[in-house]
């Protein structure tokens, strides 16, 4: 889930999704899947049976582009909770302008990034709902309610967010309901000092919700928080985009397959890959 002081990451603005992702009859399952066929080796999330009591851990965001910092957070959460992490690309979050790459491109880059990564799954709930409900604004609480309807009331569900997003959590749509409907796993950066930046209203609402261990989140459907304190990397999507646009050194910020994709597509004003010399 991306940083920001308003509802972030999981939602879409006015259901907006580029036409390239709607090419086959407006059907998300048909239009996205063929385009992902070249990204072999990635795993796609399927909604588990309601009988399953395993914690469902959702990491939403624009992933524009997905970078090594995103992957470090996802891996750390996977290892801390010993469950898969479902990475959910958003179509167009309500709090920010349209992303630099369209939904299909970001979905393809995410699939490339997690190819061969055990326990990291692609989840297309947001993209599919944006196509099914064009023109309808969607927020994180909408996604959680949709997932809750599919999973059932008793399955533990958690959202993985950054500490900077938590600081503005009380500006999210129906944030108090969201606190009860799902757990929050907060990825912290060393020395960020986010605890001191929490608004008083939010700090009061979070008091008493912090879990003693990550395992505690599996014992309740929602309502708890856990701080994922790891030596996380400092990459950001805005840093990657700025370096690409400025002709700086950027390739080390993203997985190699994603760097190749960005070059080939000319995303973020990247220079296309040079053609191979004639033999």
Name these PLM-found stretches:
Residues 8, 45-48, 52:
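Intrinsic disorder
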Residues 2-4, 14, 21-25, 29-35, ...:
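Nucleotidyltransferase catalytic core that binds NTPs
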Residues 38-39:
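N-terminal leader/targeting signatures
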């Amino acid at each position: 889930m991306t940083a920001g002081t308003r509802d972030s990451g999981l939602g879409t603005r006015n259901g907006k999704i580029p036409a390239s992702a709607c090419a086959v009859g407006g059907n998300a399952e048909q239009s996205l899947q063929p385009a992902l066929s070249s990204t072999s080796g990635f795993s796609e999330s399927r909604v588990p049976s309601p009988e399953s009591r395993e914690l469902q851990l959702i990491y939403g965001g624009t992933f524009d582009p997905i970078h090594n910092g995103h992957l470090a957070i996802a891996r750390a959460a996977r290892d801390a909770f010993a469950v898969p992490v479902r990475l959910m690309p958003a179509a167009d979050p309500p709090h920010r302008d349209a992303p630099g790459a369209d939904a299909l491109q970001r979905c393809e880059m995410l699939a490339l990034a997690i190819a061969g990564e055990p326990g990291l799954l692609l989840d297309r709930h947001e993209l599919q709902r944006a196509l099914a409900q064009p023109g309808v604004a969607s927020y994180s609480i909408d996604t959680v309610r949709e997932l809750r309807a599919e999973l059932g009331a008793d399955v533990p569900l958690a959202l993985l967010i950054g500490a900077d997003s938590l600081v503005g959590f009380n500006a999210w749509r129906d944030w108090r309901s969201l606190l009860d409907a799902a757990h929050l796993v907060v990825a912290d950066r060393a020395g960020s000092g986010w605890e001191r930046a929490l608004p008083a209203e939010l700090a009061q609402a979070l008091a008493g919700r912090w879990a003693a261990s990550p395992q505690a989140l599996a014992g309740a459907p929602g309502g708890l928080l856990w701080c994922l304190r790891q030596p996380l990397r400092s990459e950001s999507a805005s840093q990657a985009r700025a370096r690409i646009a400025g002709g700086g050194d950027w390739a080390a910020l993203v997985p190699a397959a994603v760097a190749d994709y960005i070059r080939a597509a000319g995303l973020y004003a990247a220079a296309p890959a040079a053609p191979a010399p004639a033999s």
